[in-house]
From Swiss-Prot:
Cellular component, GO annotation: chloroplast; DNA-directed RNA polymerase complex; mitochondrion
Family matches, as InterPro entries: DNA-dir_RNA_pol_bsu_ext_1_sf, DNA-dir_RNA_pol_su2, DNA-dir_RNAP_su2_dom, DNA-dir_RNAP_su2_hyb_sf, RNA_pol_bsu_bac, RNA_pol_bsu_CS, RNA_pol_Rpb2_2, RNA_pol_Rpb2_2_sf
Role of this protein: DNA-dependent RNA polymerase catalyzes the transcription of DNA into RNA using the four ribonucleoside triphosphates as substrates.
Organism field: Solanum bulbocastanum (Wild potato)
GO molecular function: DNA binding; DNA-directed RNA polymerase activity; ribonucleoside binding
Name of the protein: DNA-directed RNA polymerase subunit beta
EC number annotated for this UniProt entry: 2.7.7.6
Transferase among keywords: yes
HAMAP family in the record: RNApol_bact_RpoB (MF_01321)
Subcellular compartments: Plastid, Chloroplast
Subunit and partners: In plastids the minimal PEP RNA polymerase catalytic core is composed of four subunits: alpha, beta, beta', and beta''. When a (nuclear-encoded) sigma factor is associated with the core the holoenzyme is formed, which can initiate transcription.
Reactions catalysed according to its record: RNA(n) + a ribonucleoside 5'-triphosphate = RNA(n+1) + diphosphate
Gene: rpoB
UniProt-listed SUPFAM superfamilies: beta and beta-prime subunits of DNA dependent RNA-polymerase
Amino acid sequence: MLGDGNEGISTIPGFNQIQFEGFCRFIDQGLTEELYKFPKIEDTDQEIEFQLFVETYQLVEPLIKERDAVYESLTYSSELYVSAGLIWKNSRDMQEQTIFIGNIPLMNSLGTSIVNGIYRIVINQILQSPGIYYRSELDHNGISVYTGTIISDWGGRSELEIDRKARIWARVSRKQKISILVLSSAMGLNLREILENVCYPEIFLSFLNDKERKKIGSKENSILEFYQQFACVGGDPVFSESLCKELQKKFFQQRCELGRIGRRNMNRKLNLDIPQNNTFLLPRDILAAADHLIGLKFGMGALDDMNHLKNKRIRSVADLLQDQFGLALVRLENVVRGTICGAIRHKLIPTPQNLVTSPPLTTTYESFFGLHPLSQVLDRTNPLTQIVHGRKLSYLGPGGLTGRTASFRIRDIHPSHYGRICPIDTSEGINVGLIGSLSIHARIGHWGSLESPFYEISERSTGVRMLYLSPGSDEYYMVAAGNSLALNRDIQEEQVVPARYRQEFLTIAWEQVHLRSIFPFQYFSIGASLIPFIEHNDANRALMSSNMQRQAVPLSRSEKCIVGTGLERQAALDSGALAIAEREGRIVYTNTDKILLAGNGDILSIPLVIYQRSNKNTCMHQKLRVPRGKCIKKGQILADGAATVGGELALGKNVLVAYMPWEGYNSEDAVLISERLVYEDIYTSFHIRKYEIHTHVTSQGPEKVTNEIPHLEAHLLRNLDKKGIVMLGSWVETGDILVGKLTPQVVKESSYAPEDRLLRAILGIQVSTSKETCLKLPIGGRGRVIDVRWIQKRGGSSYNPETIRVYISQKREIKVGDKVAGRHGNKGIISKILPRQDMPYLQDGRSVDMVFNPLGVPSRMNVGQIFECSLGLAGSLLDRHYRIAPFDERYEQEASRKLVFSELYEASKQTANPWVFEPEYPGKSRIFDGRTGNPFEQPVIIGKPYILKLIHQVDDKIHGRSSGHYALVTQQPLRGRAKQGGQRVGEMEVWALEGFGVAHILQEMLTYKSDHIRARQEVLGTTIIGGTIPNPEDAPESFRLLVRELRSLALELNHFLVSEKNFQINRKEA
C-alpha cells in the first residue's frame, strides 16, 4: 500500500506509461541482474579465467533515427558494451577490454519497438502467481478431498493431498504419488526432524508402518524410492551420484524454484520467516504446507480462490526482456567456453574481444520480437488502436492458458478486477475473457500485482490522501462507489452510500466508509471510457463498441464528436499522432513536411508525417494548426494527426440520422444513406497500399530492372521511367507494370527461334534469354503512386537482395457493402445509397443522411444511442459540445433524460423551431417522405449521433473466381480471397437449391465447378466453341477419395453409373 505525494489531486496517468516504465525497469535493473549472474569461465586446465565487470556496462545511442529505421527496414537498437577481463592464473596477469556483446532493441516513448522496420509491441501476460494454493474437490463417493498445489516460478506443479485416513501424499507427476515422509526424507530431513517441525506429529506417526520406516531409514533409500516413483523406473535402481544429479536437475531445480514472488507468497500463506533471497522450496515449506492441509481437513483455515487477482501476477515487458537477456547470456557463455578450449587446443593467445561474439544476443532478441506470441505487430488502424494495443492483458502465451481449454470461470469477471481490469473491454470469439484491457488508473506494482488508486477518508484530517492498493489489500476496507467528481463534494456527504466490502456490494452509512473511488472512469479501459451514456447500454453492446472504435478508419475530413466523455484529448495526446512543441518559441517557417521553431538562441526542426502508410493500409498524415510567426508555449499542439481535430480524437462524423423503417432497405441491421455522404466526401478515406519486389543474383546472373520488356504492350509500360520503375504521381490501373524486371534463364538449343540460331552460327552472337518477372498491379489496386523506395542491399551479399517498394494511394468513398457503426454497438452494412431528394426530410427542409432500423434498439438494450442522438441534435443547433461522465444517475434520478430534454427545449427556443422539442412526443419529430412530400404516420426520433466508418470495406472483401488453384487431395478449389479460392457450397446451401428443384445447377456445383477433373477441363473447351456442356461420365474426385478411405478400413465399396439412354448399368471401379 503506497501513498501519493499529491494531496487530493488526481490526474490521469499517461496511457503508454506501463509499457515505457517496464522497459526502463529492464534497462535499470534487469540488465545488471542478469549480467551479475554471468559466471566466471575457466578452461579445462584451469589456467585462464574469463569474467565480466558489470559495473562499467554502457548502452550507446543509436546511429540512426526512428524514421530511417522504418524506411530502410532496420532495427532501432542500442549497442551494449561491457568490460571483460582474461586472467592468467599462473602469472596473475590480467587483460581487460571493453567488448561489444550485441544489440538491444530500444523502445520509443509510445511503448513500441522497431524491429526490421516494423513497429512491434510486447503485451503483458497474466499468470498464476507462484506459491501454494488449497482447494477442495468431491471424489466418486461424494467426500471432500483437500489438495494443496505448489506452483513453481516457471509454472511446474506439484500437489499435496490428504485422503480419508488423514494420510498425506505428494503427487510429483500425474500418475505416481509418494508419502510426504519419503519426500521430506529425500530433501534431507530424518524422522526426528520431521516430527519436531510439524504441528500434528501424531497424524504423521499414524501412517508410519514398517514399510515406510524402511523407505525413510536412510537418505539413500528415500532418494531411491523418490527417484523410482518420480521417473517411473522399474526394477531396483542403485544409488549413485549421477542419479542424484538427475533428480536435482529434473525435479528440484525445475519444480522447486519459487522465485522472489513465490517465496513472498509462501511466507505469507504459511506464516514462515524464510529469507527472501532463498527462492527454492525447502523441507520447512513442505511440512508447513502439510500442517495447513491437515488444518483444512479438520475445518480450520479457508480455501483459495484461484481466479482472484491476488493469486495472479503480471509478466510485464521488463520480465520478458530480462528472460530473453538471460537466455542470450547462457548462449554466450557456451560460445566463450568453446572458444577458450579451442584457443588453448590450437595454442593461440585469446583476448576478450576474440572470445565474445554479438550474434547470440542480437539473434535472441530478433527471434523473440519476431516469433514470441506476446510480441505482436502494432495495430495502427487509428490513434486509439495504438494506445489500446499496448494496454492489453493476455492469459494466453507460454506458461499461460489456451483458448480451447480455458474454462468459463477463468473467463468470467471477478470482483477483484474492480478498478484494475476493465469488465467491458475484451475480445470476441474464442479468446473472450482471456484477453482483457487495463483500467485507466491501474498500474503494475513491485511484486507483479495490479494496483488501483483510492482516496482515504480520515476523520482526523480534512484533506484526502491517495493510496494505491494491491488486489488483496482493498478487501479489508469499506470502499464507497462515489468518486471525487461528485457535484456535492463540498457539501455534507449522503447519509447512505453504496460500498464494496470483501467482494460483496453493500449499502452502508457514510461514517463507516474507509476509501472511495477517485474517478468515474476508474473501472473502465480507454475504449469503454470513450462511450457516452455507457450506463444505459447492455454490457455486450458496450464490448462491441469498444472493439469497433479500434476499427474506425481515419477520414479525409475529420470532425470532433458533439457528445463525448472528456477523454478524447488525453487519448489523442498519448497516441503520438499529434506534433507537440517540446519547448516555447516562435514559428519562423512552415511547410507541409516540417516546422522550424526558434527559441533559446537556436532553431529546432520538427518533421511532420506526410502520407505515411500504417500496417492496416490506412493513411497517417499530419496537418498544420499554427501559422508562421506565432509564439507558442511548451506542450502546445502544432499539427493534428490522422483522426484528430484540435488535439482531440475524431474517429467519425456527426450525421443526421432517423430511426425508421424505409421500404425494407434497413432490415436486419442494414443502413440506408444519402448520396450527400458520397458527393461531399463526408465518409471518404485514403488508403495506402505497399507493393514490393526483390532483385536476386541467380545462378545465371543478376536480375535486371529495366523499362525494355519484350512481348508486353506499350500502354502497360507507359508509367515507367528510364530505370524501369514507375514514376511518382502516375495514375495506375489494374495490370499496369510498376517495376520492369527480367530474370535470366537457361534455354535449350531447340527452343531458340531459327533466326537466333543463324546469328549464333554465323556471327557467334550470344542471344540473351530472359523471363519477364515484372511487378504488376493486382486487381483492385488502382490509384496514385505517392512514393517509390529503392533499398540497396547491405554488405554486397546475394542473400540480402535489393528491394523496390511502390506505395499507391487510393481514395475510397463510402459505398454499398461498407460497414458503419455508432459508439453503442449499433453496427450495420450500407444497403442502398438514395438520391438526397428521395431521403426523408425534416420540417426545416434538411434531408436525413442515414436511416437506421428502430428494431435494433429495444432487443439489444443499447439505449445510450438514443440519448446521444437527441443530445447531438441539440448540440448542433446550439453550436455546443458536451463532455459527459458516465453514471450520472448517482447525482440525480433520471439525470441523463433531464439533461437531454432540457437541451432540446433550449435549442427549440433559441432556433424558434418548435418541432425540435414537442412535449407530446419529446425527442421525436414529424418528418416527410422525400418521394411524395407527405408526412409519415408516426413521429420519428431524429438526431446527430457520431457514426464511424470501419475498416471492413467491400473493396477488400469482394471476390470472384473463374478458375484457380485446387487442393491436391480432394481436388476442390482452395478457400479464401488470398488464395484465389472458390465459394463454398455447404450442406445448407445444397438444401436450399434442392428446395427449388434446380437439378442442373446442383450438378454443376458438385461436379464441373468443384472436383470433377475431366469434366471441368471439357467445360472450358465447350464454353469457348459455344457447344453444350457434356454430362460427367465418372465419379467426382471427393467420392473417389471417400472410397479409398473406406478401403483403408477394409470396406470395399463399388459404384455404378446408369446410362440415360437405355438405362444400362455400367460397373465402374473407383
